[in-house]
Amino acid sequence: GETGADYLIFQWGLGLPATSALMSVVLVAILWLQFRQDRYRPWVYWLAVTMVSVVGTLITDSLVDTYGVPLPLTTVVFAVALIATFAIWYGREGTLSIHAIDTPPREGFYWLAILFTFALGTAAGDLMAERLGLGYLSSTLLFGAGIAVVAALWRLDIIGPVTGFWQASLNFFKTLRLPLSS
């Protein structure tokens, strides 16, 4: 997300606000296409994931760089938004399993959770790498270790597959974007 957004901002010269608006419109169109699918189509799904990653990154970057919202605050806000999404999703649907995303409301909750995961990953990754001074390599290794811990907890049956998936996803998105954004 970070790499794609930076390319549009700097190479195309669009700037952060215009890039954010353009990519948000593209995301809405791609999600519209995704919601119209009657089965899993990898190219549509992964295009949606890619666009959600770009827009999630742009949301955080816009809040921090354009509006001056501090990274610690954006990290907390996106963490709370993600937790609230999970709570409402579970309260309405009774599951957070990716294997039970078989209705439009569940798919909507899924994509909202993924969007907040990318926004949170950008905020937390930048907070650790830049603001806390850990650098990109150390932050990447730390989040990578988080994935290993989640995998071990799942393997030892300490956490279930749903918790494991979402925890690993959050750490994966943070780990993936850090080296690519440097």
Task: Give each language-model segment a name.
Residues 103-167, 175:
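Surface-exposed interaction/gating patches
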